[in-house]
Amino acid sequence: MKSGGRAAELENAIEWLVLAGIVSHVYGLDTVKKPLDNYKNIDSFKIFVSDVGLLCAKNNVLANDILYASSELNDFKGGMTENYVCSQLVCRSYECYTWFSEGEAEIDFVLQREGKIIPIEVKSADNSKAKSLSIYTGKFKPEYAIKISANNFGFTNGIKTIPLYAVFCL
């Protein structure tokens, strides 16, 4: 939800869903500095469902549509993939944040790990160019960044590539 949305009206309901473990809050960051929690913008956040299966059931997405890469799902696939990654990160006890610059770039997840701030870009397609990650790394100079996609493991130009099936390894 962006600033000016209906977050204030829904605050109690959202908080209940978070405390029940049904959804996760991913707050936007005003700036990227340690500790990240001090720079979260409580008026700008994304909500992710904790169970991707429930998300698919709610949207009438069949297993065959996913298994056989139905082109009808192209618009839904990115959000579903981000939701899957968020649920895996939360299961590993990471506090997730997001970062965006107005109209220029958006990093799906930013987390603090072993004293480092790590940007994570999630791509659902094989063609996994990460323009936003390039903008972020140019601006904040992280030690490394992570791109999660359908591609295999790799490390190029300070970007670790991790396949979707291995997100639990983070």
Regions found by a protein language model. Give the residues of each.
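Catalytic cores of nucleic-acid endonucleases
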Residues: S124-L164
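Accessory nucleic acid-recognition modules appended to NTPase machines
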Residues: M1-L111
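A short local loop/turn or secondary-structure capping micro-motif enriched for an aromatic residue
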Residues: K33, G115, N127-A130
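C-terminal helix of von Willebrand factor
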Residues: L164-L170
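Short, solvent-exposed coil/turn elements at secondary-structure transition points
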Residues: L29-T31, G53, E102, A125, ...
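Active-site beta-strand-loop-beta-strand hairpin of nuclease catalytic cores
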Residues: L111-P119
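Short catalytic-loop micro-motif centered on adjacent basic/acidic residues
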Residues: T98, P119-V122
